Structure formats: C-alpha cells, structure tokens
Amino acid sequence: MSKRPTIDTTHIMRRAEELISASSNRYRITVQVANRAKKRRRRENLEDFEDAGMKSVMQAIIEMSDELTQPEIIGE
C-alpha cells in the first residue's frame, strides 16, 4: 500500500481564497469547483484511475486558480 504524498493545506487554502476573492459571487465559484471535482471523479472512475494522492476537490481548486493566474492555459 503506497502512502499519499503530503499536501500543503495552507497552499490549497490560499488558492481557494484567491478564487473566492476574484469571483463576484462566492456561491457560484463554490459550485463551479464542486462541479469540476465531480467531473474529475467520474472520469477517474471510468478510466479505472488510481487516486493520485490528491482529492478531486483540491485538484479542481488548483486547476481553477491556475486558470485564473495563467490565462494562457485556457487558450491551449
């Protein structure tokens, strides 16, 4: 059984706060993160993907904050 890598929760919280502060509607950004995490989880289940160590919600927060700070990611 492999151990999950340690995740810096303060880093995740900072990114979540960045998303919330950049959004005009706190509820809407929360729902968007939840929907992205839900899609990721479904995809992982369909592909029989082993959990990479990070919860889908945390991964969604990181992805969305990256898209916010690096808009060139979206264009690709």
UniProtKB/Swiss-Prot annotation:
Pfam families assigned to the protein according to its UniProt record, in alphabetical order: RNA_pol_Rpb6
Keyword Nucleotide-binding: no
MF term (GO), any: DNA binding
Keyword list, A-Z: DNA-directed RNA polymerase, Nucleotidyltransferase, Transcription, Transferase
InterPro entries, per database record: DNA-dir_RNA_pol_omega (IPR003716), Pol_omega/Rpo6/RPB6 (IPR006110), RPB6/omega-like_sf (IPR036161)
Chemical reaction(s) catalysed: RNA(n) + a ribonucleoside 5'-triphosphate = RNA(n+1) + diphosphate
Catalytic activity, EC: 2.7.7.6
One GO BP: DNA-templated transcription
GO CC entries: DNA-directed RNA polymerase complex
Domain of life: Bacteria
Enzyme class: transferase
Described purpose of this protein according to its UniProt entry: Promotes RNA polymerase assembly. Latches the N- and C-terminal regions of the beta' subunit thereby facilitating its interaction with the beta and alpha subunits.
Assembly information from the UniProt record: In cyanobacteria the RNAP catalytic core is composed of 2 alpha, 1 beta, 1 beta', 1 gamma and 1 omega subunit. When a sigma factor is associated with the core the holoenzyme is formed, which can initiate transcription.
Protein family according to the UniProt entry: Belongs to the RNA polymerase subunit omega family.
Protein name in UniProt: DNA-directed RNA polymerase subunit omega
Biological source species: Acaryochloris marina (strain MBIC 11017)
Gene name for this UniProt entry: rpoZ
